[in-house]
């Protein structure tokens, strides 16, 4: 508790938004849950949460820019940016709105929309993108592992399309159609990130 109150870095507190008690004596679980909520609701730390998240993402773009078009975690507008939006906004608003806190990204995004930190349309778009990124990432891990080429081999390509189809607004019939929807989702995520956390253009990468 002392470490979280005084010394924890913002990235550690962002990671703590995902923490949950999964087992243990009820009294201990309540104490741990209360300690997590207190750490995440620190009003002094909240002041720098958004600026720190922006700085971390800028550094990641320099050092870990993503490894090909199917790296839906690290690529611009990918899963990392969805999670950064949810985590940074939770930390920023939790002191006055502890009800936003949730260890599940989708739930947190919905909570943030309820207090006006995101519009309903932004939250819905981010949730849809997060589902799509996790679906694609999961099936690629099972079928190929890291993949740097634009074209996916069979049977991975068919598997990706099957998984992605119900997660897209318009089910794609081929990989170019899926790539177009992925680009639209990435653009939406990047737009919300820059509107809520700050610009990620080259001029800020100093």
Predicted feature residues:
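A nucleotide- and high-energy phosphate-metabolite-utilizing enzyme signature
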Residues: 1-206
């Amino acid at each position: 508790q002392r470490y979280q109150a005084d010394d924890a870095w913002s990235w550690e507190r962002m990671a703590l938004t995902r923490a949950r008690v999964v087992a243990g004596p009820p009294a201990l679980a309540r104490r741990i849950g209360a300690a997590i909520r207190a750490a995440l609701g620190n009003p002094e730390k909240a002041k720098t949460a958004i600026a720190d998240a922006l700085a971390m993402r800028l550094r990641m773009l320099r050092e870990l820019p993503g490894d090909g078009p199917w790296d839906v975690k690290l690529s611009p507008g990918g899963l990392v940016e969805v999670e950064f939006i949810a985590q940074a906004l939770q930390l920023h608003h939790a002191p006055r709105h502890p009800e936003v806190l949730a260890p599940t990204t989708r739930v947190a995004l919905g909570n943030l929309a309820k207090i006006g930190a995101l519009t309903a349309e932004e939250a819905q778009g981010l949730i849809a993108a997060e589902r799509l990124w996790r679906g694609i990432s999961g099936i690629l891990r099972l079928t190929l592992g890291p993949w740097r080429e634009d074209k996916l081999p069979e049977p991975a390509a068919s598997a990706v399309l099957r998984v992605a189809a119900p997660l897209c607004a318009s089910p794609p019939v081929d990989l170019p159609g899926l790539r177009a929807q992925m680009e639209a989702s990435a653009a939406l995520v990047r737009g919300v990130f820059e509107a809520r956390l700050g610009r990620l253009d080259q001029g800020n990468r100093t």
